[in-house]
Swiss-Prot record:
<keyword id="KW-0863">Zinc-finger</keyword>
<dbReference type="InterPro" id="IPR040459">
    <property type="entry name" value="MJ1316"/>
</dbReference>
<dbReference type="InterPro" id="IPR009097">
    <property type="entry name" value="Cyclic_Pdiesterase"/>
</dbReference>
<dbReference type="GO" id="GO:0008270">
    <property type="term" value="F:zinc ion binding"/>
</dbReference>
<keyword id="KW-0862">Zinc</keyword>
<dbReference type="Pfam" id="PF10469">
    <property type="entry name" value="AKAP7_NLS"/>
</dbReference>
<dbReference type="InterPro" id="IPR000571">
    <property type="entry name" value="Znf_CCCH"/>
</dbReference>
<dbReference type="InterPro" id="IPR042653">
    <property type="entry name" value="Leng9"/>
</dbReference>
<dbReference type="InterPro" id="IPR019510">
    <property type="entry name" value="AKAP7-like_phosphoesterase"/>
</dbReference>
<keyword id="KW-0479">Metal-binding</keyword>
<feature type="zinc finger region" description="C3H1-type">
    <location>
        <begin position="8"/>
        <end position="35"/>
    </location>
</feature>
<dbReference type="InterPro" id="IPR041367">
    <property type="entry name" value="Znf-CCCH_4"/>
</dbReference>
<dbReference type="Pfam" id="PF18044">
    <property type="entry name" value="zf-CCCH_4"/>
</dbReference>
<protein>
    <recommendedName>
        <fullName>Leukocyte receptor cluster member 9</fullName>
    </recommendedName>
</protein>
<feature type="region of interest" description="Disordered">
    <location>
        <begin position="212"/>
        <end position="247"/>
    </location>
</feature>
<dbReference type="Pfam" id="PF04457">
    <property type="entry name" value="MJ1316"/>
</dbReference>
């Protein structure tokens, strides 16, 4: 029985090979006695198969701008100029915030489809021609490759020397007219896009006339979706921010007369409907007051802050009271334990800033020192904490008494006057965060039933700190300590 079992498991020898007439050779599925072992076959991608997706230049731009660990000053951009060929400029020299159509002469801006490569400290990290991506690790047949964070954490062993592949036609700027459209279609799926800007593209009509077509805001470079402006968690120093997207306006009909100041540009469908009743668009523009209709335009999207000015909690009595409140929270809701703010990281955020690079950090420290030492700051000498407040089932915090609203507004105005980029959220007030649950998590904080000891819950206001926000899941980094006296 055992012999029959062994014989059933082992495949039978090819009888045609024994007779010397097996026409399959090495491809035969039956074993050939004495034949060399076949070499392992490496599967190659079939011709015409779809290549792995390569993250676009828009994704790289967004990553450089919004990742706190990346310094935009370390990057440079290689792009195709219509007349000069491929040029390379520092990343910070480009204007990434305004629509291309709104920029005037002398402002450096480039559409997304003209970008050829990115360099990080002189090394090529993203190249369209060679499908190199050391920012996200995309575009590799073998799967995810090394990323920019791997290189930052591990050193040079993750880097491979890559040379940018530049066609001869691009080196001299010859034959670029048709190249722009082809590259735009290849990367954007048929729709040329700019670098997150409202680009104006020229299209030829019949008869040789040229008309301008607005493509609208490029959705591929929108700010990462994070907490909205009404979320009070935005002032804890680590929360990402989001403002509503700017709405698109209807294209207006052309009005020949400009002498009447109250004439209003109406949507084309509305103007046509009015003209059918015997009135022209110009006449109806005078009848309809602009104030009748509500303004649908919303504020532009706020940039994500990278730094913040904060008051650190240093009093041991206040820290002990916060720990007691957190322990009470864990007893009634054990699932909230992982979302508690450590006692050594307790702080109140006063100002949110958007800074890029060590140079702006040093300038912000000097500007903050001047703003604090200037008279009229209205800073209270001591803060008291008693009541706990739940903000949207995601943030448990304690509000200070007296409030820091006046001091925060004064600092915002003074730092803006110094030329710093301040992220303003007027609906938010400085508060002490005890626990914070990220949005999208199923856990909800319960209603607070604990009150801090008013005698122990005190914090003198003598120093402010300039801090850099950490990555997701990491704490912030204090940079500069500035005394209020």
């Amino acid at each position: 029985m055992e012999a029959s079992a062994d014989s059933s498991e082992a495949p039978a020898v090819c009888r045609f090979f024994l007779e010397g007439r097996c026409r399959f050779g090495a491809r035969c599925r039956q074993p050939h006695p004495g034949a060399p072992a076949p070499s392992p076959v490496v599967t190659q991608p079939e011709a015409g198969s779809k290549k792995p997706a390569l993250r676009t230049a828009a994704d790289v731009i967004r990553r450089i701008r919004w990742d706190p660990r990346l310094d935009p000053a370390d990057f440079s951009v290689g792009y195709t100029d219509r007349f000069l060929g491929v040029q390379e400029e520092p990343f910070c020299a480009f204007c990434w915030d305004e629509p291309l159509a709104a920029l005037g002469p002398g402002v450096l801006a480039v559409p997304q489809h003209r970008i050829r490569y990115f360099r990080f400290r002189g090394r090529l990290v993203w190249d369209r021609a060679s499908r190199t991506d050391l920012i996200f690790g995309s575009g590799s047949v073998a799967g995810r490759g090394p990323t920019i964070l791997d290189a930052l954490d591990g050193g040079d062993e993750h880097w491979t020397e890559v040379t940018a592949e530049i066609p001869d036609t691009e080196k001299t700027g010859v034959g670029l007219e048709g190249l722009d459209t082809q590259d735009a279609l290849a990367e954007a799926g048929g729709n040329p896009t700019g670098t997150g800007l409202d680009s104006g593209l020229e299209t030829h009509e019949e008869g040789g006339a040229i008309k301008e077509t607005r493509t609208g805001l490029d959705s591929s470079l929108e700010t990462p979706e994070v907490d909205g402006p009404t979320k009070e968690t935005g002032l804890n120093g680590t929360t990402e921010l989001e403002m509503p997207d700017p709405s698109m306006n209807f294209s207006g009909v052309k009005i020949s007369s400009v002498e009447e100041p109250r004439a209003t540009l109406l949507p084309q469908w509305q103007a046509q409907g009015m003209e059918t009743k015997g009135l022209s668009a110009e006449e109806m523009g005078n009848v309809w007051d602009p104030g009748v209709w509500p303004d649908d335009r919303r504020a532009p999207r706020q940039p994500r802050p990278t730094h913040f000015v904060a008051l650190m909690v240093t009093e041991s009595g206040l820290r002990a009271e916060v720990v007691k409140a957190q322990e009470h929270l864990v007893r009634i809701a054990p699932s909230c334990a992982e979302f508690l703010v450590p006692a050594q990281a307790l702080h109140l955020t006063v100002v949110l800033l958007r800074l890029t690079g060590p140079g702006e950090e040093a300038a912000a420290a000097r500007a903050l020192r001047r703003a604090i030492l200037k008279p009229g700051l209205q800073a209270p000498s001591q803060l008291q904490f008693r009541d706990l407040v739940l903000l949207g089932h995601h943030v448990l915090c304690a509000t200070p008494s007296p409030t820091l609203t006046g001091m925060a507004q004064t600092l915002n105005q003074r730092l803006e006057a110094e030329g710093l980029r301040v992220v303003l959220l007027p609906e938010l007030q400085p508060h002490l965060t005890l626990a914070k649950v990220p949005h999208g998590t199923q856990v909800c904080l319960p209603k607070p039933e604990y009150t801090l000891n008013q005698e122990l819950g005190r914090q003198p206001l003598s120093k402010l700190w300039l801090c850099r926000m950490g990555r997701a899941g990491h704490s912030y980094l204090p940079l500069v300590e500035i005394s209020l006296k």
